[in-house]
Structures are given as C-alpha cells and as structure tokens.
C-alpha cells in the first residue's frame, strides 16, 4: 500500500537561502535562532531550557540545518542515530509567500512576479476599492495599509464594529486581507465580500484574498477565529496533487491546504484549527487512508501565531509539542509509506519586522525505501513533488529531481 503523509511546518526555515540578499534576509534562520534563544534562557515563557526536539532530530533535522548553515543549532549535534533521509532545499519561485512555497514543493514553481501593494499607507488603488464597495453595497472601509493582523484589530476593531466598515489591509506578501467581526458584520457577508474582491483583483495578479474573521468586544479582547478562508488563484500548471487525483488516487487536505491550492487536486477536505486539532485530524486521516493516497496538513500556527508575531517562546513551545506527538504518526506508518516533513518559507521570530524570511527549508523523508542519510542541498522545493510523483509512479513533473529511485 502506497501512501504519502506530508506535514508542512509552516514557516520553519533552516537558514538563509542563496538569494536571501535580494529579500533583505541575509542571516535569517528560523530554526537556528529559536534554538539559540532557548539555549540562552531567552525563551522560557511556558517552557524552559534548550530546545528539545528528539524525534525531529532522529529524522535528521539537526543535520539538515547543519548542512544548510555550516553548524548545528544550539543543543543539536551528531550524537543522534538518524533514522531518516534529510536534506535542505532552496526555492526557485520569485516570492517567499505561502502559495509559492506550497506549489513549488508540489512540483510547480512560481517563476513570474506576483503583484504587490507596496505602499505602506493608502495601499490600494481607489478604482479597485470603489468597485469592491459598490458591488458589496458598502460605501466606506477602514485600513488601506500594511499591518499585522493582530495590531490592526486593536487599532480599528472597535470602529469597525461601530460603523460596519470592513477593514482592508495587506503586507509584504501578495495578499488582500479583509478583517470583519463574525457577529456584528457576519461571517457569510465577509466571505461574499472576499469573493467580490477576488474577482476584482483579477488584473492585479494578487496571490490571495484572505478572510480574517474575529470576535471580541474591544482592544485586548479581539481574537481571530478558525473561520479564516484563503481565496487563491489556481497554480499555473497541474501539481502532483492534480496528477494523483487524475490517476484515481485520493488527496486529503487537512487545514488550509485546499485553500492554498485553490481546491485543485483535492478529493477530501478536513477542517481543523489549532496545532492539537490539526495533529489529531492528521492521525485520523492516516488511519482512514487507503492505497494511493496523500494526506497533506499545513500546521499554520508556527507561522501565524508565532513567526509573524515574533514570539520565540511560543514557537519553541509549539515545536516541542509537535515533536512530542511525532511517534504517534510513525507508529501508523506501513513499510511502504512515505512521510515527508518540510516548510514553505521562513518566518524568523527574531528578525526585524513581521514578515516572512527567505530561507531554505528542511526536507525530512522517511520510508519509501529511502536509506537514512543525507539528501544534500536540493536546488528546488520541486524535488519533493518530483519524488512524490516517482513514488506513485506518475508522469514526471516538469521541474525537480527525484530523490526516490
């Protein structure tokens, strides 16, 4: 029985990419800087001491990081019996965003430039917002700027609730984000507004419109909910997910995977919110999975809760929780199964600002007849997609070199 389980640790980079200078990210290292802060006692909120990831270390995480940066992260070394194949990958895609990383690892790099709203204030063209408002039956909106999602709620959440004006904002990514209160504005109304925005953005080449529903009564109590939706453009070519689906296989999305791929190549969607629930849902879907199935989970909290918010201790806590549950996944694997752990970009919680960082990502592969040891530097995330295609004996992808023979 052939099954692939992909666990995407959203934003868990292992050191600056070869082209990090073009992004202002030379020296960024999500994993390494978290480990360093833990070793120095600077990440003791809700945990303490060195970063403890024994199961990820056995899969080769520390070794992959050393190959990427030239040194082991603090607290990691070669005194571990590695049971998996490990490597690190550079990105071909032009951006350091979520769709680019996900699509490329599924065999389809983004070799064109996304559109961006680069102005920090007055970020959106008035012609665009006028059309969105007119179609939605609204007259005004709030925001029109770059912001972190939690900051803008404290700044504008009360005014939004009082006036009913939606909050439009963006970031360094190719996104148009809309935040609205679930109760005072309404969840379905927010989704309808996002669909309108998605349609009106067709000429702007924006990767995603993101619905950001929240609850609460005032600054300090506002909280984003698990009802986020991403309205992405479709990948520019069929991914390995599409190819497996076309061949009669099953592709199970856990969490926001389906949204990231614009629901292309997905046969089943499982909703889950939060690290614990996402892990539980992954376990359940692996138990249910039959032959020729991909179970694909995005563990978004690493990025959204801790990377962007520059919360080193929170990131470390969540990594340690994730690591503690890995034996549950390993226990479910059959001899022929293929487990793949990776990331889509970096988001170094020690880095200035609140945006993603251009980093190499870990490639931790277990099963599928792979011998334990180094896979080296992969020149593209697409090597993972090509390897999945090879594993399922699908038609080869245009990009990537398989590490499964």
From Swiss-Prot:
<dbReference type="GO" id="GO:0043094">
    <property type="term" value="P:metabolic compound salvage"/>
</dbReference>
<comment type="function">
    <text>Isomerase that catalyzes the conversion of deoxy-ribose 1-phosphate (dRib-1-P) and ribose 1-phosphate (Rib-1-P) to deoxy-ribose 5-phosphate (dRib-5-P) and ribose 5-phosphate (Rib-5-P), respectively.</text>
</comment>
<keyword id="KW-0479">Metal-binding</keyword>
<dbReference type="Pfam" id="PF01676">
    <property type="entry name" value="Metalloenzyme"/>
</dbReference>
<dbReference type="InterPro" id="IPR017850">
    <property type="entry name" value="Alkaline_phosphatase_core_sf"/>
</dbReference>
<keyword id="KW-0963">Cytoplasm</keyword>
<keyword id="KW-0413">Isomerase</keyword>
<keyword id="KW-0464">Manganese</keyword>
<dbReference type="InterPro" id="IPR006124">
    <property type="entry name" value="Metalloenzyme"/>
</dbReference>
<protein>
    <recommendedName>
        <fullName>Phosphopentomutase</fullName>
        <ecNumber>5.4.2.7</ecNumber>
    </recommendedName>
</protein>
<feature type="binding site">
    <location>
        <position position="308"/>
    </location>
    <ligand>
        <name>Mn(2+) 2</name>
    </ligand>
</feature>
<dbReference type="GO" id="GO:0006015">
    <property type="term" value="P:5-phosphoribose 1-diphosphate biosynthetic process"/>
</dbReference>
<feature type="binding site">
    <location>
        <position position="344"/>
    </location>
    <ligand>
        <name>Mn(2+) 1</name>
    </ligand>
</feature>
<dbReference type="GO" id="GO:0005829">
    <property type="term" value="C:cytosol"/>
</dbReference>
<comment type="similarity">
    <text>Belongs to the phosphopentomutase family.</text>
</comment>
<dbReference type="InterPro" id="IPR024052">
    <property type="entry name" value="Phosphopentomutase_DeoB_cap_sf"/>
</dbReference>
<comment type="pathway">
    <text>Carbohydrate degradation; 2-deoxy-D-ribose 1-phosphate degradation; D-glyceraldehyde 3-phosphate and acetaldehyde from 2-deoxy-alpha-D-ribose 1-phosphate: step 1/2.</text>
</comment>
<dbReference type="GO" id="GO:0000287">
    <property type="term" value="F:magnesium ion binding"/>
</dbReference>
<feature type="binding site">
    <location>
        <position position="10"/>
    </location>
    <ligand>
        <name>Mn(2+) 1</name>
    </ligand>
</feature>
<dbReference type="GO" id="GO:0009117">
    <property type="term" value="P:nucleotide metabolic process"/>
</dbReference>
<dbReference type="GO" id="GO:0006018">
    <property type="term" value="P:2-deoxyribose 1-phosphate catabolic process"/>
</dbReference>
<feature type="binding site">
    <location>
        <position position="356"/>
    </location>
    <ligand>
        <name>Mn(2+) 2</name>
    </ligand>
</feature>
<feature type="binding site">
    <location>
        <position position="303"/>
    </location>
    <ligand>
        <name>Mn(2+) 2</name>
    </ligand>
</feature>
<feature type="binding site">
    <location>
        <position position="345"/>
    </location>
    <ligand>
        <name>Mn(2+) 1</name>
    </ligand>
</feature>
<dbReference type="GO" id="GO:0030145">
    <property type="term" value="F:manganese ion binding"/>
</dbReference>
<dbReference type="InterPro" id="IPR010045">
    <property type="entry name" value="DeoB"/>
</dbReference>
<dbReference type="GO" id="GO:0008973">
    <property type="term" value="F:phosphopentomutase activity"/>
</dbReference>
